A protein has these predicted regions:
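Extended, charged helical/alpha-beta scaffold domains that provide interaction surfaces
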Residues: 1-307
Length: 307
Protein backbone atom coordinates (compact mmCIF):
# COMPACT_ATOMS: atom_id res chain seq x y z
CA UNK A 1 0.00 0.00 0.00
CA UNK A 2 2.90 2.38 0.75
CA UNK A 3 4.34 1.61 -2.68
CA UNK A 4 0.95 2.25 -4.28
CA UNK A 5 0.58 5.66 -2.57
CA UNK A 6 4.07 6.62 -3.68
CA UNK A 7 3.20 5.75 -7.26
CA UNK A 8 0.05 7.87 -7.19
CA UNK A 9 2.09 10.82 -5.90
CA UNK A 10 4.49 10.42 -8.85
CA UNK A 11 7.41 9.89 -6.52
CA UNK A 12 10.44 8.54 -8.38
CA UNK A 13 11.20 5.11 -6.97
CA UNK A 14 14.38 3.10 -7.14
CA UNK A 15 14.15 0.23 -9.61
CA UNK A 16 16.57 -2.61 -10.22
CA UNK A 17 16.69 -6.00 -11.88
CA UNK A 18 18.36 -8.66 -9.77
CA UNK A 19 19.60 -12.07 -10.87
CA UNK A 20 18.87 -11.12 -14.50
CA UNK A 21 15.09 -11.45 -14.15
CA UNK A 22 13.80 -10.28 -10.74
CA UNK A 23 12.14 -6.83 -10.89
CA UNK A 24 12.55 -4.83 -7.65
CA UNK A 25 10.81 -1.46 -7.11
CA UNK A 26 11.46 0.52 -3.90
CA UNK A 27 13.08 -2.63 -2.44
CA UNK A 28 9.92 -4.64 -3.06
CA UNK A 29 9.77 -7.68 -5.32
CA UNK A 30 7.35 -6.97 -8.19
CA UNK A 31 7.74 -9.93 -10.51
CA UNK A 32 9.98 -11.51 -13.13
CA UNK A 33 11.13 -10.91 -16.65
CA UNK A 34 10.56 -14.02 -18.75
CA UNK A 35 12.22 -13.51 -22.08
CA UNK A 36 10.71 -10.27 -23.34
CA UNK A 37 7.62 -10.26 -21.12
CA UNK A 38 6.98 -9.06 -17.57
CA UNK A 39 5.16 -11.39 -15.22
CA UNK A 40 3.97 -9.37 -12.22
CA UNK A 41 3.63 -10.97 -8.79
CA UNK A 42 0.51 -9.12 -7.66
CA UNK A 43 -1.00 -9.87 -4.26
CA UNK A 44 -4.60 -11.05 -4.18
CA UNK A 45 -5.52 -8.17 -1.87
CA UNK A 46 -4.34 -5.47 -4.27
CA UNK A 47 -6.97 -3.01 -5.48
CA UNK A 48 -7.55 -2.66 -9.21
CA UNK A 49 -6.27 0.93 -9.06
CA UNK A 50 -3.13 -0.31 -7.29
CA UNK A 51 -2.58 -2.99 -9.93
CA UNK A 52 -2.88 -0.44 -12.72
CA UNK A 53 -0.34 1.85 -11.06
CA UNK A 54 2.03 -1.03 -10.31
CA UNK A 55 1.91 -2.29 -13.88
CA UNK A 56 2.60 1.19 -15.23
CA UNK A 57 5.55 1.72 -12.90
CA UNK A 58 7.02 -1.71 -13.54
CA UNK A 59 6.78 -1.37 -17.31
CA UNK A 60 8.40 2.04 -17.26
CA UNK A 61 11.21 0.58 -15.17
CA UNK A 62 11.88 -2.46 -17.34
CA UNK A 63 11.59 -0.80 -20.75
CA UNK A 64 15.36 -0.08 -21.09
CA UNK A 65 16.22 -3.66 -20.08
CA UNK A 66 13.79 -5.15 -22.60
CA UNK A 67 15.14 -2.95 -25.38
CA UNK A 68 18.66 -4.05 -24.41
CA UNK A 69 17.53 -7.67 -24.68
CA UNK A 70 16.06 -7.04 -28.11
CA UNK A 71 19.49 -5.78 -29.16
CA UNK A 72 21.15 -8.96 -27.84
CA UNK A 73 18.69 -11.17 -29.71
CA UNK A 74 19.17 -9.23 -32.94
CA UNK A 75 22.95 -9.60 -32.64
CA UNK A 76 22.79 -13.38 -32.14
CA UNK A 77 23.22 -15.63 -35.16
CA UNK A 78 21.27 -18.73 -34.17
CA UNK A 79 17.53 -19.23 -34.51
CA UNK A 80 15.57 -22.38 -33.81
CA UNK A 81 12.04 -23.26 -32.83
CA UNK A 82 10.74 -26.09 -30.68
CA UNK A 83 8.02 -28.65 -31.37
CA UNK A 84 5.23 -26.25 -30.42
CA UNK A 85 6.61 -23.69 -32.90
CA UNK A 86 7.82 -21.20 -30.32
CA UNK A 87 11.11 -19.34 -30.83
CA UNK A 88 12.86 -19.05 -27.48
CA UNK A 89 15.56 -16.90 -25.92
CA UNK A 90 17.12 -18.28 -22.73
CA UNK A 91 14.34 -20.90 -22.52
CA UNK A 92 11.54 -18.32 -22.72
CA UNK A 93 9.34 -17.84 -25.82
CA UNK A 94 9.75 -14.55 -27.66
CA UNK A 95 7.82 -15.42 -30.84
CA UNK A 96 5.78 -18.21 -32.41
CA UNK A 97 5.00 -19.48 -35.90
CA UNK A 98 1.60 -19.78 -37.59
CA UNK A 99 0.67 -21.21 -41.01
CA UNK A 100 1.47 -18.97 -43.98
CA UNK A 101 0.76 -19.16 -47.72
CA UNK A 102 2.53 -22.54 -47.95
CA UNK A 103 4.54 -24.82 -45.69
CA UNK A 104 7.85 -23.10 -46.54
CA UNK A 105 6.52 -19.64 -45.66
CA UNK A 106 5.16 -19.60 -42.10
CA UNK A 107 4.12 -16.36 -40.43
CA UNK A 108 5.90 -15.11 -37.31
CA UNK A 109 4.19 -13.39 -34.37
CA UNK A 110 5.98 -11.78 -31.41
CA UNK A 111 5.48 -12.66 -27.74
CA UNK A 112 6.72 -9.45 -26.13
CA UNK A 113 5.69 -6.96 -23.47
CA UNK A 114 3.89 -3.69 -24.16
CA UNK A 115 6.83 -1.93 -22.51
CA UNK A 116 8.80 -2.43 -25.73
CA UNK A 117 8.35 0.45 -28.17
CA UNK A 118 6.99 -0.12 -31.68
CA UNK A 119 10.30 0.57 -33.38
CA UNK A 120 12.05 -2.13 -31.32
CA UNK A 121 9.20 -4.56 -32.00
CA UNK A 122 9.50 -4.03 -35.74
CA UNK A 123 13.29 -4.35 -35.56
CA UNK A 124 12.96 -7.65 -33.69
CA UNK A 125 10.27 -9.06 -35.97
CA UNK A 126 12.18 -8.19 -39.14
CA UNK A 127 15.31 -9.76 -37.67
CA UNK A 128 13.60 -13.00 -36.63
CA UNK A 129 11.79 -13.30 -39.97
CA UNK A 130 15.11 -12.82 -41.77
CA UNK A 131 16.81 -15.51 -39.67
CA UNK A 132 13.91 -17.90 -40.20
CA UNK A 133 14.03 -17.42 -43.95
CA UNK A 134 17.81 -17.89 -43.91
CA UNK A 135 17.38 -21.17 -41.99
CA UNK A 136 14.78 -22.45 -44.46
CA UNK A 137 16.81 -21.36 -47.49
CA UNK A 138 19.96 -22.97 -46.08
CA UNK A 139 18.56 -26.32 -44.92
CA UNK A 140 15.85 -26.73 -47.58
CA UNK A 141 17.57 -25.12 -50.57
CA UNK A 142 16.41 -27.73 -53.10
CA UNK A 143 12.78 -27.41 -51.99
CA UNK A 144 13.00 -23.63 -52.18
CA UNK A 145 14.52 -23.83 -55.67
CA UNK A 146 11.79 -26.27 -56.69
CA UNK A 147 9.09 -23.81 -55.61
CA UNK A 148 10.75 -21.04 -57.64
CA UNK A 149 11.73 -23.10 -60.70
CA UNK A 150 10.63 -21.76 -64.07
CA UNK A 151 10.69 -24.46 -66.77
CA UNK A 152 9.22 -23.97 -70.24
CA UNK A 153 8.07 -27.58 -70.59
CA UNK A 154 4.54 -28.01 -69.18
CA UNK A 155 5.25 -31.55 -68.00
CA UNK A 156 8.36 -30.45 -66.10
CA UNK A 157 6.47 -27.58 -64.47
CA UNK A 158 3.68 -29.95 -63.48
CA UNK A 159 6.19 -32.44 -62.05
CA UNK A 160 7.88 -29.71 -59.99
CA UNK A 161 4.52 -28.52 -58.69
CA UNK A 162 3.44 -32.04 -57.70
CA UNK A 163 6.80 -32.74 -56.05
CA UNK A 164 6.64 -29.51 -54.04
CA UNK A 165 3.06 -30.25 -52.99
CA UNK A 166 4.28 -33.62 -51.67
CA UNK A 167 7.19 -32.14 -49.69
CA UNK A 168 9.86 -33.40 -52.05
CA UNK A 169 8.97 -37.13 -52.14
CA UNK A 170 6.39 -38.96 -54.25
CA UNK A 171 5.69 -42.27 -55.95
CA UNK A 172 6.72 -42.32 -59.59
CA UNK A 173 3.66 -44.34 -60.63
CA UNK A 174 1.40 -41.36 -59.85
CA UNK A 175 3.00 -39.20 -62.54
CA UNK A 176 4.71 -41.79 -64.73
CA UNK A 177 2.87 -40.63 -67.87
CA UNK A 178 4.16 -37.13 -67.19
CA UNK A 179 7.71 -38.42 -66.72
CA UNK A 180 7.65 -40.25 -70.05
CA UNK A 181 6.99 -36.93 -71.80
CA UNK A 182 10.10 -35.28 -70.36
CA UNK A 183 13.10 -35.05 -72.69
CA UNK A 184 16.68 -36.00 -71.79
CA UNK A 185 17.61 -32.32 -71.76
CA UNK A 186 14.84 -31.51 -69.28
CA UNK A 187 15.80 -34.50 -67.14
CA UNK A 188 19.33 -33.11 -66.99
CA UNK A 189 17.91 -29.74 -65.89
CA UNK A 190 15.89 -31.46 -63.19
CA UNK A 191 19.01 -33.26 -61.95
CA UNK A 192 20.78 -29.89 -61.70
CA UNK A 193 17.82 -28.65 -59.67
CA UNK A 194 18.35 -31.56 -57.25
CA UNK A 195 15.52 -33.80 -58.50
CA UNK A 196 16.10 -37.56 -58.67
CA UNK A 197 13.84 -39.51 -61.05
CA UNK A 198 14.21 -42.99 -59.67
CA UNK A 199 12.78 -46.36 -60.58
CA UNK A 200 10.01 -46.16 -57.98
CA UNK A 201 10.10 -42.63 -56.61
CA UNK A 202 10.81 -39.04 -57.56
CA UNK A 203 12.50 -37.16 -54.75
CA UNK A 204 15.09 -34.62 -53.62
CA UNK A 205 18.03 -36.62 -52.17
CA UNK A 206 19.43 -33.72 -50.12
CA UNK A 207 16.04 -33.30 -48.47
CA UNK A 208 16.41 -36.77 -46.92
CA UNK A 209 19.30 -35.64 -44.73
CA UNK A 210 18.42 -35.56 -41.00
CA UNK A 211 18.38 -31.76 -40.55
CA UNK A 212 16.38 -31.26 -43.72
CA UNK A 213 13.83 -33.93 -42.77
CA UNK A 214 13.41 -32.49 -39.29
CA UNK A 215 12.84 -28.93 -40.53
CA UNK A 216 10.65 -29.63 -43.54
CA UNK A 217 8.41 -32.04 -41.62
CA UNK A 218 8.05 -29.58 -38.72
CA UNK A 219 7.01 -26.89 -41.19
CA UNK A 220 4.68 -29.34 -42.95
CA UNK A 221 2.98 -30.28 -39.66
CA UNK A 222 2.52 -26.60 -38.83
CA UNK A 223 0.77 -26.05 -42.16
CA UNK A 224 -1.19 -29.32 -41.98
CA UNK A 225 -2.18 -29.72 -38.29
CA UNK A 226 -3.90 -33.07 -38.91
CA UNK A 227 -0.40 -34.58 -39.24
CA UNK A 228 0.70 -33.29 -35.81
CA UNK A 229 0.04 -36.66 -34.16
CA UNK A 230 2.56 -38.47 -36.36
CA UNK A 231 6.19 -38.84 -35.31
CA UNK A 232 9.24 -38.33 -37.53
CA UNK A 233 11.39 -41.52 -37.64
CA UNK A 234 14.71 -41.28 -35.82
CA UNK A 235 17.53 -39.99 -38.01
CA UNK A 236 19.98 -42.53 -39.40
CA UNK A 237 17.41 -45.28 -39.93
CA UNK A 238 17.03 -46.89 -43.35
CA UNK A 239 14.60 -49.61 -42.27
CA UNK A 240 11.51 -49.53 -40.03
CA UNK A 241 9.18 -52.23 -38.79
CA UNK A 242 5.48 -51.53 -39.09
CA UNK A 243 4.78 -52.72 -35.54
CA UNK A 244 1.88 -50.33 -35.00
CA UNK A 245 -0.50 -48.72 -37.42
CA UNK A 246 1.58 -46.05 -39.12
CA UNK A 247 0.43 -43.48 -41.64
CA UNK A 248 1.90 -44.44 -45.02
CA UNK A 249 1.36 -41.01 -46.57
CA UNK A 250 3.13 -39.21 -43.72
CA UNK A 251 6.04 -41.67 -43.70
CA UNK A 252 6.43 -41.26 -47.46
CA UNK A 253 7.00 -37.50 -47.13
CA UNK A 254 9.51 -38.41 -44.39
CA UNK A 255 11.21 -40.51 -47.08
CA UNK A 256 10.01 -44.06 -46.29
CA UNK A 257 8.12 -46.43 -48.61
CA UNK A 258 5.84 -49.10 -47.15
CA UNK A 259 6.20 -52.82 -47.86
CA UNK A 260 3.49 -54.43 -45.74
CA UNK A 261 5.29 -54.97 -42.40
CA UNK A 262 8.31 -52.83 -43.26
CA UNK A 263 9.35 -49.37 -44.41
CA UNK A 264 12.49 -48.57 -46.41
CA UNK A 265 13.97 -45.17 -47.14
CA UNK A 266 13.36 -44.33 -50.79
CA UNK A 267 16.97 -43.46 -51.66
CA UNK A 268 18.16 -46.73 -50.10
CA UNK A 269 15.51 -48.58 -52.09
CA UNK A 270 16.96 -47.13 -55.31
CA UNK A 271 20.46 -48.24 -54.31
CA UNK A 272 19.17 -51.73 -53.50
CA UNK A 273 17.55 -51.94 -56.92
CA UNK A 274 20.86 -51.02 -58.59
CA UNK A 275 22.68 -53.73 -56.59
CA UNK A 276 20.11 -56.28 -57.70
CA UNK A 277 20.62 -55.27 -61.35
CA UNK A 278 24.41 -55.57 -60.93
CA UNK A 279 24.01 -59.10 -59.50
CA UNK A 280 21.33 -60.19 -61.96
CA UNK A 281 22.14 -63.20 -64.15
CA UNK A 282 19.44 -64.74 -66.32
CA UNK A 283 16.67 -63.25 -64.18
CA UNK A 284 18.23 -64.46 -60.91
CA UNK A 285 20.40 -62.65 -58.38
CA UNK A 286 22.44 -63.69 -55.40
CA UNK A 287 21.77 -62.02 -52.06
CA UNK A 288 24.96 -60.81 -50.41
CA UNK A 289 25.85 -59.10 -47.14
CA UNK A 290 26.19 -55.71 -48.88
CA UNK A 291 22.48 -55.73 -49.70
CA UNK A 292 21.48 -56.61 -46.15
CA UNK A 293 23.87 -54.07 -44.64
CA UNK A 294 22.57 -51.39 -46.99
CA UNK A 295 19.02 -51.84 -45.72
CA UNK A 296 20.16 -52.14 -42.12
CA UNK A 297 17.97 -55.08 -41.13
CA UNK A 298 18.41 -58.72 -40.12
CA UNK A 299 18.82 -61.46 -42.71
CA UNK A 300 15.45 -62.86 -41.68
CA UNK A 301 13.69 -59.54 -42.23
CA UNK A 302 15.46 -59.08 -45.55
CA UNK A 303 14.03 -62.35 -46.84
CA UNK A 304 10.58 -61.37 -45.55
CA UNK A 305 10.95 -58.07 -47.38
CA UNK A 306 11.72 -59.83 -50.68
CA UNK A 307 8.62 -61.94 -50.27
Amino acid sequence: SILSRSLKQDIILGTEIKNENEVIIDNQYMGQLKGLKLELDLKSGSLKTDIKSLKKAARQAISPELIRRVGKIVESEVLSFNDDYKICWKDHPIAYLTPGKNYLNPKLELLVDDAIDQESKEKLKNNLEGKLQKLITSELSDLVKLSEAKFQNNYVRALCYQLFENNGVMKREIIDKMVKNISKEDRASLRKAGVKIGRYHIFLPKMLKPNAVDLRIKLWKLHFPNDQKYIIPKSGLNFLKNESKKNNKFLLICGFENFDKFYIRVDILERLFLKIIENNKNGMFKIDSDMINLIGCTKENFFKLLE
